[in-house]
Amino acid sequence: MASGDGANGGGGGGQGKLPRKRFYRARAHSNPLSDSHFPIPISPDEVDLSQHYPRYFPSGEGEARQGDAAVPRIRFADVGCGFGGLLVGLSTLFPDTLMIGMELRDKVTEYVKERILALRASNPGKYDNISVVRTNSMKYIPNYFRKAQLSKMFFLFPDPHFKEKNHRRRVISMQLLDEYAYVMEVGGIIYTITDVEELGEWMRSCLEKHPLFEAIPEEETKADPVVKLLSTATEEGQKVARNGGQTFQAIFRRISLQE
C-alpha cells in the first residue's frame, strides 16, 4: 500500500484539532462499479500495516511481518465507513483489536484520516487501533484480508440503489457474501442496518439464503454491546434518530458449511 494511505502522518489532525466536515464535502455515495484510481495491494501480504498502526508496527515492518501468525491482524472491517463514527466508538470498546474503515470517496477518506490523527494526538495511547483506507470493497476485499481473518464486518446505511437495474451495485448480494464469508472466521458476525425497509429486507433475504450465514437470535443481539452503536455512532444513524425514522437490522453469524 502506498505511503500515506493509512492514518499515519499529514494534515492538521496531527496537532490534535478535529477536522471540519464542511472542508471535506463529497457526494453521498459513489458508483462502486466505476474504475477509480488508487493503489491496491496485490495480496494481503502487500498491506503495509505500519502505515495504519504505527504503534503496533514500527515503520517498514508492517508488510514484512504480515505473514507472521504471532503479530496482530485486522479483525474488524467497517465497509463504507463514512465519516468514521463507528470506528471511533468501537476503538474504545475493543482497545486491543485492530480495525479498519474502507471508504470509496476520497474526501471522506481524508476526513477520517485526519479525524483519527487528531484523536490520537489529543488522547495519547488511544485510537491507535483504528485506521482507514480508500478502496472499493466490492472489488478488492480479498486483496486486504486472508481467509478467516475477520471476526466482524459492518455494513451501516449502505447506498440503497433503488432502481432495479442498479441492484447489482448493492454491497450485500449473494455473490459478494461469498467473498465476505471467505475472509470471515467461523463464528464471526456480520452487522447490517438501514433506514430503507426494502433494502433491509433485501439484505436479510440474501443472508438467509446464503448457506454460510445464520441469523443471530434477538435475545443474543440485545446482549451484544456493538448493536447499540449501529444506530447511534454514525452520522447517518444520528440523522435517522433526529427525524424519528425507523431502522432495519440484519445480524448474522458466519457458520461452517452444513454437510
From Swiss-Prot:
PROSITE patterns the UniProt entry points to: SAM_MT_TRMB
Active site: 159
Principal subcellular localization: nucleus
Cell compartment(s), UniProt: Nucleus
Gene Ontology terms: biological process: RNA (guanine-N7)-methylation; tRNA methylation
UniProt keyword annotation of tRNA-binding present: yes
Pfam families in the cross-refs: Methyltransf_4 (PF02390)
Catalysed reaction, written as an equation: guanosine(46) in tRNA + S-adenosyl-L-methionine = N(7)-methylguanosine(46) in tRNA + S-adenosyl-L-homocysteine
Pathway: tRNA modification; N(7)-methylguanine-tRNA biosynthesis
Gene Ontology MF terms in the entry: tRNA (guanine(46)-N7)-methyltransferase activity; tRNA binding
Alphabetical keyword list: Methyltransferase, Nucleus, RNA-binding, S-adenosyl-L-methionine, Transferase, tRNA processing, tRNA-binding
Gene3D superfamilies associated with the record: Vaccinia Virus protein VP39 (3.40.50.150)
GO cellular component, one term: tRNA methyltransferase complex
Source superkingdom: Eukaryota
Family: Belongs to the class I-like SAM-binding methyltransferase superfamily. TrmB family.
HAMAP family: tRNA_methyltr_TrmB_euk
Biological role stated in the UniProt entry: Catalyzes the formation of N(7)-methylguanine at position 46 (m7G46) in tRNA.
Protein's name according to its UniProt entry: tRNA (guanine-N(7)-)-methyltransferase
